[in-house]
Amino acid sequence: MENNFRGRYRPASAESIVVANYIRYETLAEITNTAFAGSNANVLNVYIDLYQLFRKMYRSDVAIGNRSSVAAAVVNMCIHYRAFYKKYYGVHTRIYLMQTSGPMLMNEKFYPDYNHTNIEKMMLADMITTFMIQNTAILKELCKYLPDIYYIEGPYETSVMINSTIMDRTDNSPNMIISSSSLQYAVPVFAKDQTIVIDHKWVENNIRYRIVDKYNALIELLAKYKLSDNTIKKCVNINPQLFGLFMAMTRNEHRDLYSFNNVSNTLNIFNHAINRHEIPNAYISPEYTEMISLLAPDRTEELVNRYKAVDLTYQTELYRMSNNYLDRSWDVNLQDPDMVKLLNEKYFRDNPIDIDRI
């Protein structure tokens, strides 16, 4: 459930929106001691959902800076997290900056209105869009020279790209995803290594956060929806591997996936079907249409398409067959302090990078 930590930040500019999303050290310590208690790992993979962060900038009241101001704020955020884990836990961080570029075509293929509200906002905000293109281009170039900081982008949900990146890792190191997107909640459920999502936000000078893991993903989703305890109790025996199917049968308004059925009825349908052994209490592929038809016999085709649009496993399979996945140009780790210093002087004179703590 949500935890609170007092603090202050009120976004006024694009870069201040990034700064406002830094998780302070007191809160990081609380999260780390709770989520990774007893871990002997010496490396932590940190995934930062830039798309979810940057979408907050497409508002008329946000002032924009220069072509590197947001890039500097993001890199300093990475340094902020790296310095914390190095100083207090002796743990090295590999940091992945995940960004969705353009429309999410593989989601739209099955649900044409997918994420159209966010896309329209970006298309109408020409000045902010140009500003962000400049900043992300500089950020992408800079990451090549920063030790173990990577910039990955593509026309896919960041949760899909994160899930795929975790699948490719072979060292069993734990993963922490920093994002306010509920779609990320499915990643810990299917990850082979310990993975958590930190969903945090500032509300009236307080930081509120929830820690999502492979066991509580559905419970935390319903808590985020601010549903009653009685409704939440209905999901306690439902395997979180049904997360994607549950979302397809309900809603995700941030991606314009509008209501198919209400939450309480959906949970009743799930529990009934599981208890009668009509469906397994485990992951069901969207390809199993006969089984899915038992949940919505009059709207099976619509449900299957919605499910294909939001299901993490299905979308990850599509991503891993794409040219975006095959393109490994992001996987560059030149570790060139002189080049970092040169780029800092060239692009970040007004917004310097804290290079001494990299």
Regions found by a protein language model. Name each.
Residues 7-13, 35-45, 83, 87-96, ...:
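Non-catalytic nucleic-acid-binding/docking modules located in mid-to-C-terminal regions
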Residues 10-173, 190-203:
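Noncatalytic, basic helical substrate-engagement surface that gates or grips nucleic-acid strands
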Residues 177-179:
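Conserved RecA-like ASCE P-loop NTPase motor core of nucleic-acid helicases/translocases
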Residues 185-186:
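Hydrophobic, aromatic-enriched interface-forming segments
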